[in-house]
């Protein structure tokens, strides 16, 4: 079993209430070992967020509401990240993307190669990935099927993500998004229509902008796309 680890999750869990880098590193090592044992993993890959992120280039306010939490990071936070990458051979810094993107890319590659894997994260955004997931904070193992993952993805496009400062369509939360997609035979077309109904002539632009922020890569540079002719046809029906 290959563990595909969102390293940022273990990193933030490890610095909680820790006074020194050495204490946090010890905690990280403990979390890492316990996680692999919990899912019976024989190997792993792990990603930590690097210094650059295309989403910030697209939308400077992306995750802007997390400024306070960033300011509360210990002075040794970045040194700890570097130490982890140096210590763990299977760990990398991301390049122009986020740990989430690499997790989904690796999971997608495993699916194509028929490699048993488990996604390790507490981030619900990764529920767009089919297969087995493990939440190390709750110690919970669960499985996502293809239909759930697909609907979850399009619900996210409708709602945006207040945690990351992504607007989506205002006043659409989980229940309303579920109702919009409930009887849909084509989630993509239904979402196109919802954006048009709220934003009018600007609907396509808002859909692309939100989609590019929400969409988690399945392969490198796998940016969100919807063809304009598909959108135009969807809003006419």
Predicted regions: what is each one?
Residues 54-66:
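Short beta-strand-loop
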Residues 1-45, 49-57:
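Non-catalytic, usually N-terminal nucleic-acid engagement modules in DNA/RNA processing proteins
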Residues 8-9, 57-60, 124, 164:
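Flexible, active-site-adjacent loop/turn segments at secondary-structure boundaries
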Residues 15-16, 58-60, 129-134:
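Short acidic, glycine/serine/threonine-rich loops at helix termini
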Residues 37, 60-62, 197:
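Short, mixed-charge, low-aromatic patches
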Residues 27, 41, 65-236:
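Extended two-metal-dependent nuclease catalytic cores across DNA- and RNA-processing enzymes
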């Amino acid at each position: 079993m290959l563990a595909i680890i969102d390293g940022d999750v273990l990193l933030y869990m490890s610095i909680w209430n820790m006074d020194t880098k050495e204490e946090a590193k010890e905690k990280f090592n403990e979390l890492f070992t316990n996680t692999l044992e919990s899912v019976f993993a024989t190997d792993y890959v792990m990603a930590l967020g690097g210094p650059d992120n295309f989403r910030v280039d697209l939308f400077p306010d992306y995750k802007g509401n997390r400024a306070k939490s960033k300011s509360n990071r210990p002075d040794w936070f970045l040194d700890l990240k570097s130490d982890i990458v140096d210590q763990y051979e299977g760990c990398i810094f991301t390049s122009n993307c986020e740990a989430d993107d690499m997790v989904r890319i690796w999971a997608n590659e495993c699916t194509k190669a028929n490699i048993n894997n488990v996604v390790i994260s507490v981030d619900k955004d990764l529920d767009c990935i089919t297969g087995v997931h493990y939440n190390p904070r709750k110690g919970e193992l669960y499985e996502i099927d293809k239909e759930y993952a697909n609907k979850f993805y399009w619900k996210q496009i409708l709602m945006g993500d207040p945690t990351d400062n992504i607007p989506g369509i205002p006043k659409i939360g989980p229940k309303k998004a579920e109702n919009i997609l409930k009887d849909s035979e084509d989630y993509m077309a239904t979402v196109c229509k919802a954006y048009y109904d709220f934003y009018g002539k600007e609907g396509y632009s808002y859909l692309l902008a939100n989609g590019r922020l929400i969409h988690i890569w399945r392969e490198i540079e796998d940016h969100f796309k919807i063809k304009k002719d598909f959108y135009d046809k969807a809003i006419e029906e």
